[in-house]
């Protein structure tokens, strides 16, 4: 039969598309196609005239049924091309005799399903007779094979149980379960013979090695009668686990011819493929996919197969090796990540690779920090060991070192190291480390869900260090009531008086009608009991009171010893509270702090009765500690014996409880913890009492912060009649700071200032849960009420500084007081803005907010801007230049705000800087453009809805006045001294340009609009209206009336004028001086009442300017006086 052309390029393309196809599949296809291509050589008489009925020279094509694409065409063409590509020896096919379709009538059998024995069919192995071919002439009736090159390797036949021992037979289960290579089998079947079933099952056990290859190809022939009618069977799909082939038994036998057996390349896996069964005439051709264990083949056979398939499998082997390397690499990485997850978060956690690596990084950083702390502690102990003379000194040094206010007092360093590191994100599992301190007995959520710690088991807690549970507040209050009852009713005196008879009862008992000679003696004997009994009773009462006090303060105080179960529970809840505070989960943090107090034996009151008892006890305890009795007894909590270790543990326990109470009080003050004023007062008193009992264990800054928090509670919760207690707590905080270190923390220094102290005690302010948005300061620490009060004080200082300029009081308006007072407030504001607690500070329970401060850039910027404006008004340009860099860098918060006031302030500063700079000879249009932009932002600010803040109105007045002063200064500089002299004699002076007049009128309109709601702006309206008329050259009569309002400020106001003065504020010294200069320089001489009035006005202005401290303006006034005096002298002469 003809072969279809199939080039090498197409084969390469097909191999590229296959990609990861196994080389074993190519080997199977090669074996199948080799047999099909060599069918003419294997069966030379298959299509001859005895079978086909045609002539030998017939060249007609074969029947379509015999050469259907499913059976012959495609496999033959593919096999030929594959053999050409793989370099296999190809047998030349002999001439075929086609079978005519009319005489051959090939019969297509349908596909047979997998065989299952029926009731009438018996499965039994049929031995086949194996005949060796004769060396000479073959016998008639046998099929002679043509000569063809031998295959690369053949297996010698071996008898197998249940199968014919042919090299080309089916691979079955050997005794050793050795898998044989695939081969081809041809069987001839004839009708009339009973069917024979050959059933194989591939098993997986290995024992027997395959037989060595023979040196020459062998032909095994099974003789049988062959029926002349060819039968073509459809391809059957045979499973690997149950291989079944059913053939029709012929009359005498079957003729079988073996093809060359190809070996599998090492490492190839044979894929299961369909069994191709081809029958032509009476011969059945079948191929079976097999699996060969290459590890058990001889080396020389493996080498032969690798040489034959080396060129075809090189690319596949490279890809397979690369994929295997990548797979091993990924498997190794995944195994290490799983191992890392088990070490960091435990075996039951469900995390992805990124989360595992992130947790590992956090845990490594935690361990590094812990190791650094341990190294420092070891170094300190080593130095102490070198300096100490004995072990007792070293132990005492270690005990004294534990008194510092660190975060983990009372727990050994190894306990600190095994605490749970913080998780990476809020959504991470609660069990963040297998080394976290677990609790078997805790019943709450949060960190209690962590697994039990391998370090701290219940059996490892030291039993010799017992935990003192202490007394509840109800028991303490009952004991106090008992003591008070004993002191008031004195039951011991009544008891002694009833038990010992008095003199009257004794005389009555011995009274008789006769005379008693011993009565005087007995009366003298009973007098000593009357004198001795009251001291004994009071002594007994005193002993009873001392015993009750010792029971309350010494033996009733709960003491938590380190390395005990309550201490472990406390530190777990406290660390979890720190994490919750850092994440902003304040409700969960409050819950953890509540559990921490419960672990210390100090549960918070849950009912109204418990709350009342706790509050009364804390009040009594604070009064006793003010008398130093309670503080002295509390210093010996745990026992009256002189045990330094127990005393240090008692102080550390009191310190830990005080810090937790204080943090809960701060959360309540900021609205993060629910409860009324009584609960807050109880928390404040508890924190204060325990902090005083802790002594040196509490740092100075923490104790002062607790005192200030108590003063805040008095200011917030108690009525106004009891607000004097704030002075007491503030003085206690100041004394505590000065007694220990001699300095006050930076965050509390403003409380020691008279202005700050007055604001705290007498100011009308309140702490809000949610900090209000402000344009003049930033929000501080959200859990620190003192930071919010500091923010309110900064805004108060800014308002006071602005009011000193806008509406100075009559007492401070004399001289330079209005400017100096404003600068003093601004300096204090700068110091306070450097001591504001920022949101980035630590949220730890043990951290002191007073010692952790930041900077408020917004308040600092407004203070610098106001100071620059004041320096400009004072004509002190050198001081203003020092603040230019601070004002030019506007904070990012103000740049992003939607309110136009900050932008109006910035552009007003730029415009005034360009117009008031006397070193510039000319002010170009660029300065006017900046001034117009500032005026636009100012008008937008005035048009915005009012916020109700007085700082906004005062700041708007300052900016509007600054723009008008800058425009006036630019107009005055444009005039020469000659033009000023002309103004004295002419009715009109030098007029400003239309652009300047329009801008001035717009700013003046903004000032009038502001004066409608802010009365202090009315004084500036009169003065700037007069300036506008002078710039426009208007009638001087109205100008003189406007200036006269500022010139008559010194006239005494009568009773009727008091109301007018309230409606029209009196002008300040600065306004009076400006009016004098405008009137003397720009009003015509006809409007002056006397010839020498101009010089008198200039002299008065010079004296006022000297008081204000404006040296440059004073120099200008003196020069004008010299010019006027010289002119007068020349005229008079």
Swiss-Prot record:
The keyword Iron-sulfur does not apply. Residues 367-388 are annotated as: Leucine-zipper. Residues 165-180 have a biased composition (Polar residues). GO terms for cellular component: cytoplasm; endoplasmic reticulum membrane; ER to Golgi transport vesicle membrane; Golgi membrane; nucleoplasm. Keywords: Activator, Cholesterol metabolism, Cytoplasmic vesicle, DNA-binding, Endoplasmic reticulum, Golgi apparatus, Lipid metabolism, Membrane, Nucleus, Phosphoprotein, Steroid metabolism, Sterol metabolism, Transcription, Transcription regulation, Transmembrane, Transmembrane helix, Ubl conjugation. Residues 227-486 are annotated as: Interaction with LMNA. GO terms for molecular function: chromatin binding; DNA binding; DNA-binding transcription activator activity, RNA polymerase II-specific; nuclear receptor activity; protein dimerization activity; protein kinase binding; sterol response element binding; transcription coregulator binding. Residues 1-60 are annotated as: Transcriptional activation (acidic). Residues 46-78, 131-219, 415-456 are annotated as: Disordered. Activation by cleavage is down-regulated upon activation of SIRT3-dependent PRKAA1/AMPK-alpha signaling cascade which leads to inhibition of ATP-consuming lipogenesis to restore cellular energy balance. Residues 498-535 are lumenal. The record marks 452-453, 479-480, 518-519 as: Cleavage. Phosphorylated by AMPK, leading to suppress protein processing and nuclear translocation, and repress target gene expression. Phosphorylation at Ser-396 by SIK1 represses activity possibly by inhibiting DNA-binding. The 9aaTAD motif is a transactivation domain present in a large number of yeast and animal transcription factors. This is Sterol regulatory element-binding protein 1. It comes from Cricetulus griseus. The lineage of its organism: Eukaryota, Metazoa, Chordata, Craniata, Vertebrata. The gene is SREBF1.
